[in-house]
A protein has these predicted regions:
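Cell wall/extracellular polymer interaction/catalysis modules
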Residues: 1-28
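Exported/periplasmic cell-wall-interacting domains
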Residues: 23-28, 33-107
Length: 107
């Protein structure tokens, strides 16, 4: 995550589960809003998160306290439903420095 041209956060994440067809959709988006202490709800999950920053429909950047491993090929078999799961300390730093409208590039 860059702010004012300076790198603030460089972290491993887990994106959408490729093998289940939940890939995080590639594209250029913008942060829609940010919310503390949200509960993310889907057909088969309800996950409380401390830092929620959606950028496309119900897809966003958030902490994932239930995860112990981030990065690498984790997304292939143990990925998210499309969100960008981020270690809590890094999600907090992003949350505290990001604003509505900031571009998000997913590739």
């Amino acid at each position: 995550f860059y702010k004012n041209g300076q790198l603030l956060v460089d972290t491993d994440v887990v994106t959408g589960n490729h093998n289940l067809g939940h890939d995080t959709k590639t594209g250029i988006y913008a942060i829609m809003y940010k919310e503390r202490n949200a509960t993310l709800v889907g057909e088969d999950y309800s996950s409380p998160v401390k830092y929620w920053m959606p950028f496309y429909a119900n897809v966003g950047i958030h902490d994932a306290s239930w995860r112990t491993t981030f990065g690498g090929s984790e997304y292939l078999n143990n990925g998210s439903h499309g969100c960008v799961n981020t270690p809590e300390a890094n999600a907090e730093k992003i949350f505290n420095n990001i604003e509505k409208g900031v571009p998000v590039v997913v590739y």
